[in-house]
Amino acid sequence: MQKIMISDAAQAHFRRLLDQQEEGTHIRIFVVNPGTPNAECGVSYCPPNAVEATDTEMQYASFSAFVDEISLPFLDEAEIDYVTEELGAQLTLKAPNAKMRKVADDAPLLERVEYVIQTQINPQLAGHGGRITLIEITEDGYAILQFGGGCNGCSMVDVTLKDGIEKQLLSLFPGELQGAKDVTEHQRGEHSYY
């Protein structure tokens, strides 16, 4: 695994915090409930006596980040930044693989499509309280999807399917997928986004 990308601003922020701690203290980056929909990433102080033999050390300009053995694969492609805005500054930690372990490029098509749905598409739909589930991939190359949450019964579901999800899947899996189809029995209700 490559080193977690920590921006210069975030490194400076960590250095300021670490300067107020006991000498030899570094940071720990971790995932609670990795590989589940409830996965949460975090950063904490890591005093010298808290380093485990199985930890991976990632060295930066003025400190190290330690990652435990279980969290490590779920932090692949993670990025940490320190963003300053009008209302203040905040640390952002993006870990696209925290909820689902990255699949190999040569994994079966079903697994690769499921990975994209869980790490790229569902996080976008979650803003509207929605999600999709991959039911199957047909022999003729169609991803059969079921919409849930705020997407179920939403009047914009056809646009979301064709202009959003299908376009994204076809661009990522050219020649492997022919399209996406919805098998949801839509029932409009208060849960529907539009």
Swiss-Prot record:
InterPro entries reported for this sequence: Fe/S_biogenesis_protein_NfuA, FeS_biogenesis, FSCA_dom_sf, HesB-like_dom_sf, NIF_FeS_clus_asmbl_NifU_C
Keyword Iron-sulfur found: yes
A Pfam family reported for this protein in Swiss-Prot or TrEMBL: Fe-S_biosyn
Keywords tagged on the record: 4Fe-4S, Iron, Iron-sulfur, Metal-binding
Note on cofactor: Binds 1 [4Fe-4S] cluster per subunit. The cluster is presumably bound at the interface of two monomers.
Gene: nfuA
Family as reported in the entry's similarity comment: Belongs to the NfuA family.
Quaternary organization: Homodimer.
Organism lineage string: Bacteria, Pseudomonadati, Pseudomonadota, Gammaproteobacteria, Pasteurellales
Cross-referenced PANTHER family: FE_S BIOGENESIS PROTEIN NFUA (PTHR11178:SF51), IRON-SULFUR CLUSTER SCAFFOLD PROTEIN NFU-RELATED (PTHR11178)
Cofactor(s) named in the record: [4Fe-4S] cluster
UniProt-listed GO biological process terms: iron-sulfur cluster assembly; protein maturation
Name of the molecule in the record: Fe/S biogenesis protein NfuA
Function: Involved in iron-sulfur cluster biogenesis. Binds a 4Fe-4S cluster, can transfer this cluster to apoproteins, and thereby intervenes in the maturation of Fe/S proteins. Could also act as a scaffold/chaperone for damaged Fe/S proteins.
Annotated Gene3D superfamilies: Fe-S cluster assembly (FSCA), HesB-like domain
Recorded superkingdom: Bacteria
Residues the entry annotates as binding [4Fe-4S] cluster: 151, 154
